[in-house]
Amino acid sequence: MKKIEAIIKPFKLDEVRSPSGVGLQGITVTEAKGFGRQKGHTELYRGAEYVVDFLPKVKVEVVLADENAEAVIEAIRKAAQTGRIGDGKIFVSNVEEVIRIRTGETGIDAI
């Protein structure tokens, strides 16, 4: 099993959460703030300058079977891409075990 974590721009969430042709069982979405190469930026508010160090992002997490990982990664990449700095990152890691709390199911059946 794989866990895919994608850090994306918030306005891309609707496109990422329902990629066409990929049967996702479910996702977890978390609001986040951060910066990468683009760093922050300066904003002017009521005549005063403010440095915005952390930019709003959304973290999307999906756990799925190994054989579905590449298709989901590509679907997320295509949906989240704007071609501009700050599009985000996708992290892929192995998941050793999944347990559904309600039923006690384990492994791929628990997803």
From Swiss-Prot:
Parts forming coiled coils: none
GO CC list: cytosol
An example molecular function term from Gene Ontology annotations: enzyme regulator activity
GO BP: any one term: regulation of nitrogen utilization
Keyword set, alphabetical order: Nitrogen fixation, Nucleotide-binding, Phosphoprotein, Transcription, Transcription regulation
Entry keyword Endoplasmic reticulum: no
Name recorded for this polypeptide: Nitrogen regulatory protein P-II
Disulfide partners: none
Modified residues (O-UMP-tyrosine): Y50
Quaternary state and interactors: Homotrimer.
Top-level taxon: Bacteria
InterPro entries assigned: N-reg_PII, N-reg_PII-like_a/b, N-reg_PII/ATP_PRibTrfase_C, N-reg_PII_CS, N-reg_PII_urydylation_site
Source organism of this protein record: Rhizobium leguminosarum bv. viciae
Aminoacyl-tRNA synthetase listed as a keyword: no
Family: Belongs to the P(II) protein family.
Function: In nitrogen-limiting conditions, when the ratio of Gln to 2-ketoglutarate decreases, P-II is uridylylated to P-II-UMP. P-II-UMP allows the deadenylation of glutamine synthetase (GS), thus activating the enzyme. Conversely, in nitrogen excess P-II is deuridylated and promotes the adenylation of GS. P-II indirectly controls the transcription of the GS gene (glnA). P-II prevents NR-II-catalyzed conversion of NR-I to NR-I-phosphate, the transcriptional activator of glnA. When P-II is uridylylated to P-II-UMP, these events are reversed.
